[in-house]
Amino acid sequence: MRLNAQLASLLLSSIVLVGSAHGADEEPVAEKKEASSIERPTFVPTTIKAPFVEQFTDKWDSRWSVSHAKKEDAKSDEEWAYVGEWSVEEPTVFKGIEGDKGLVVKNPAAHHAISAKFPKKIDNKGKTLVVQYEVKLQNSLSCGGAYMKLLQENKKLHSEEFSNASPYVIMFGPDRCGATNKVHFIFKHKNPKTGEYEEKHLKAPPAIKVTKLTSLYTLIVNPDQTFQIRIDGEPLKNGTLLEDFTPPVNPPKEIDDEKDTKPADWVDEEKIPDPEAKKPEDWDEDAPFEIVDTEATKPADWLDDEPTTIPDPEAVKPEDWDDEEDGDWIAPTVPNPKCEEGSGCGKWEPPMIRNPAYKGKWSAPLIDNPAYKGVWAPRKIPNPNYFEDKTPSNFEPMGAIGFEIWTMQNDILFDNIYIGHSIEDAEKFKAETYDIKRPIEEAEEEASKPKLSPQIDDETDISFTQDPIGYVRAKIDRFISLAQDDPIAALQAVPEVGGAIGAILASLLIIIGMFGLSSPAPPAKSTGKTAEKTEKEKTTEAVTASGADSGQGEAKKRAAKSG
C-alpha cells in the first residue's frame, strides 16, 4: 500500500507539472487569419442550355416545391412526415464564388423532400444521358444521404406531393451511414412481359468523398449501354448496364425444371472404400494412444516424503471458534513451498508419451467410384419468362428531379445541377463552376489551418536545461495545435508528448494492477458447524438491519447459539 501511495503521488506530481506547464502564461499558440485575403470571383449565371440546368438563382422557389407528405414505410407502423426545412444560401464553409448560392438541408436528424419539374419530359431513347451536380458537406457526413432521384413522368407526378413512394427512374449520388459508404446508381427497369418495375443496383459502387469542399458527382450513360461515374471529374467506375447490375436486366434463357427429380439409382458417391484392400497383419487396432515413458527417471530433487499441500502457517483460529460446538478447528491448506522449489513432491510416476505403435482403427483407402455419375442437377428447360432487352439505357421518360433524404448532418449544399445529353456541355459547365470554386475552397481550407507561433516552432532556442517549464509547455502547445488537424502527424512531430501520455497511461494501469494484487485474500470457507454459525449470524444481522429492536435481536442471537 505504501508503494501504491508513492506511485500515485508521483503520477499526480507529473500531471500537475504538465498542467502547470501548459497553463502557465496562457498565450495563443495558434493564430487564425482574421479575414481571408483570397480573392473570389463574382457569380455569373451560365448560358449553357440543357433539358434541366439549375443554379438556384432568383425565383428558385417557383421552380422547386418542398414536400410535407407522409413517408410510406411498410416495415413500420410509425408515420414519418417530411419536416426538414430547405434554404437557398451561400456556403458558410470555404466559400468559393461570391454570390453563388445553393440548395441547403437545414435540419439534422430529419426527413427532407423537395422536387422540381422539368420544363419538358426527358426522353433518353437512343441518347446519352448526363447527370451532374455538386455536393458540399459543410458539416461533414457520418450518417445520411445526398443522392438525387429522377422521377418518372406520369399523372401522379403532377397531382401528388413528392415522397419516397413517388416512382423514380434513376437514383444517383452519395450515401454514407455505418458500413454503407457508396455512390448509388440504381435504375428501374420495366419487365416487358409482366409490366412490373424492378430496381437494378450497381455492383461494387465507388466510395463517396467526405470533405467540406465541393465535390462534383457525374453519371454518364451511353446508348451502347456503357456507363461511367466520375467524382471531381475523375472516372472512378466504368461498366455496362447489361453486366454490372444486380439483379441482371435480362433473365436466363433456361431455368431448372422444377418437376425433374433425381433417379433412384443415381450414384452421388465420387469415392468408395477399396473393396480389395486388406488390413495389414501387423496392424494393432487395440494399441493405446499413450504409453508410460520407460526411459524417464525421477529427478534428483524430487521430494517423495513431502506432501503437496500443508496447513497455512499464517492461519489463525477465529476468536469466536467454539471447539465443543464447532468441532476441532483445522487450518486451511496452501501449496507446499518446498514443492515449488524443487521438481515436485509426493509419489513420483513416470510421464505418459505417445505410443509409436498406435495406428487406430483401420479403414480401407478410398478409390474412384466406377459407378459415379457426377453431381445431379435438374434438367434445363426454356425459361417461360425470358426476354431480352438490349437497350436498357432507353429509360422511361423522366419528368422531375427530387431530393428525398434523411441525414444526421445539416448544411448539405447542392448546386449546379445539369441533366441533359451532352458530355461536352457538362464539362463546360464544370469549367465555369466547379473548376473555379474548388481551388479557391482549397486555399480557404489551407488558410484556415492554425498558424504556429514562434514559441512552439521546431527551431525554438529553448532548451530543457535552461527552462524546463518553458520547454515542456512549448512541446505540449505544439502537440495540441498539430493534433487538432492530424493526431498521427502530431505524434510523429512531437514524440516526447506522445511518450509522456503513454507513460501516464501505463502508470495508471500499473497502479490499478497493484491495487488488485494487494487486496486481501478472501477468508477461508467455513465448514461444518462453522458454516451453520455463520448463517445464524447473517440472519441476526439482517434482523438488526431491518429496524427491529436491538435487544430483541440480541436475544434471538443467544437463543440461536444455545440451540
Curated annotation (Swiss-Prot):
Matches recorded under PROSITE patterns: CALRETICULIN_1, CALRETICULIN_2, CALRETICULIN_REPEAT
Listed InterPro entries: Calret/calnex, Calret/calnex_CS, Calreticulin/calnexin_P_dom_sf, ConA-like_dom_sf
Record: glycosylation sites: 238
Signal peptide stretch: 1-23
Main location per the UniProt record: endoplasmic reticulum
Compositional bias ranges of the Basic and acidic residues kind: 253-281, 530-540
Protein topology in the membrane: Single-pass type I membrane protein
GO MF: calcium ion binding; unfolded protein binding
GO cellular component, one term: endoplasmic reticulum membrane
Domain of life, source organism: Eukaryota
Keywords from the named record: Allergen, Calcium, Chaperone, Disulfide bond, Endoplasmic reticulum, Glycoprotein, Membrane, Metal-binding, Signal, Transmembrane, Transmembrane helix
Binding-site list for Ca(2+): 100, 415
Topological domains annotated Lumenal: 24-496
Function of the protein: Calcium-binding protein that interacts with newly synthesized monoglucosylated glycoproteins in the endoplasmic reticulum. It may act in assisting protein assembly and/or in the retention within the ER of unassembled protein subunits. It seems to play a major role in the quality control apparatus of the ER by the retention of incorrectly folded proteins.
Protein name listed in UniProt: Calnexin homolog ARB_00147
Protein source organism: Arthroderma benhamiae (strain ATCC MYA-4681 / CBS 112371) (Trichophyton mentagrophytes)
